[in-house]
Amino acid sequence: MEANKIKGEAKSLILDNGVELTYCERGEGNKEVMITGAFYFHTFMPVVELLAKHYHVYGVVMRFDGSGEELEPDGSIHWGRQWGKDIYDFAVKMGIERFHYLGKCHGTIPGWWLFKNHPEVLIDFCSFFLAPHLKGQTSNTWFELLSGNDTSKMMAAAMRKVETGLPKKMEEMKSIGNSASSPAVPKYAACPEKLWDTLEDCERDLLNAPVPVGYMFGSEDPLMADYFESNMYAWKVTRGCHFTILNGEKHLMELDTPERVADEAFVFIDQAHKDYE
């Protein structure tokens, strides 16, 4: 169990294929289920706690190792697809038939896999800070910051409230240690479109979206700027989507204003199932 990747009580589940998944569980008294995936749950935990006021929330750690069934042509694991399959297998094992899915940045990848392969289990899908990229990349600021040695520069670009947010982020990284990084991150974590064989297939599925999709971005997020044209195009082609850009917000919005992240999810879910015809 990767208990160090969760702040507070951590649990684990052994899937039928023998893989162990680490997860947290909050809001057990609520009827509706929400699943959210992430590499770790420390600075994102306040969002989980807020979501748990309305939903029975499972936060599932997206793993970097172990066996997998979703493979690349060369036999290596396609981690983008495997993260999605893990969430699906988790839900099946837990007896969860349908659920809301919320992902932020890399955490959206399992949601897009479910959207593509098992939309029947999704009530709706909050895809926050990331959309499939159908129009290419205009810059590479975010991953250049991540790979650089200037932590203060990266944090200043990633959050508004550096003075309060930086200590929390550094505490998180200390708890996680070397397990925070993997070659899977730059290859799969910011590229939902890689779940499809072609961009044409991806666009077709967006045009015929089988479940409500809620996009949210921060106007000052470097990753938003890196894929600006693609993000705006996703808004145009995703059938019936909810699309929000929050002025002034940056990438680590869960540190700056976790309440608004949760509130945007609540607003989207409330509107997603109303009949506007």
Regions found by a protein language model. Name each.
Residues 15-70:
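Conserved HGGG/HGGXW glycine-rich cap/lid loop of the alpha/beta-hydrolase fold
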Residues 58-102:
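Active-site loop/oxyanion-hole signature of alpha/beta-hydrolase fold enzymes
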Residues 103-107, 111:
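Gly/Ala-rich beta-loop-alpha elbow adjacent to hydrolase catalytic centers
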Residues 136-137, 152-209:
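Conserved alpha/beta-hydrolase catalytic His-Asp/Glu region
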Residues 214-249:
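Conserved loop-alpha-helix segment in the C-terminal half of the alpha/beta-hydrolase fold
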Residues 240-277:
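Catalytic active-site module of serine/aspartate enzymes centered on a nucleophile-bearing elbow/loop
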